[in-house]
Amino acid sequence: MKRLQWAKSHQHWTVDDWKRVIFSDETKVNRFASDGKAYAWKLPHEELNSRHVQQTVKHGGGNIMVWSCLTWEGVGWIVDVGHRMNSEGYLEVLKDDLLKTMESYGLDSSKVVFQQDNDPKHTSKIVKEWINQQPFEALEWPPQSPDLNPIEHMWAHLKRELFHSYEAPPTSMHELWERIGQTRYAISKEECQKYIESMPKRCAAVIKAKGRWTKLFCQI
């Protein structure tokens, strides 16, 4: 199993090794909370307000598909990639937003290891050719392994902040995008480092599970 082989081949990587990795992924951010059930919390003495009540919305209220990356220095640039991004569009994201992230954090690209999953857009010929021409190294990634990617914690953090930091849902997609940009800054460098520091534990969990999927991503 590729997941098990990958975890074994990286089980001796130290946190210093993982510090070099830029983890990347896309995620869908809904205008009205989650994809399925919606939950709200209030203190016993609190009165029910607009934050606690989910409005009924025709057609689900809409969502934005975004790309970003997670580095040891903090959250990378976040970009709205649309719902039909192809390999050409993804390549533009790498050329623009990935490189801007490296530049903004002062990262030495020759020491960077770039991670992406095996989505066909990511593994297309034009993307592979461009990556092969870059000074940074590409990290081979096992299939179906979101539990190994610490950026999933970053996305969960961002979505929690979007839900809890405002009294009411955004009134438009433009406002949702504005909130995403603002919420990015609520995720600290220290939190990003905590997520990346979990990589040895993630590898160990996959080995213990003999390559099967783990629940570690819920337990940091």
Where are the model-predicted features located?
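C-terminal anion-handling pockets and recognition modules
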Residues: 16-21, 27-28, 144, 151-220
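Acidic/histidine-rich, metal-coordinating catalytic segments
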Residues: 24-26, 94, 108-122, 145-149
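Preference for well-ordered, secondary-structure-rich cores of eukaryotic proteins
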Residues: 106, 113-114, 126, 133, ...
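Extended, low-complexity cationic-aromatic segments
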Residues: 2-99, 209-210
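Structural signal for hydrophobic/aromatic residues that build the beta-strand cores
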Residues: 7, 24-25, 68, 114-117, ...
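Short, well-ordered secondary-structure "scaffold" segments embedded in the functional core
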Residues: 93, 102-104, 114-115, 131
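Surface-exposed helix-capping loop/turn segments at secondary-structure junctions
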Residues: 102-112, 188-194
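RNase H-like polynucleotidyl transferase catalytic core
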Residues: 53, 114-118, 132-153, 166
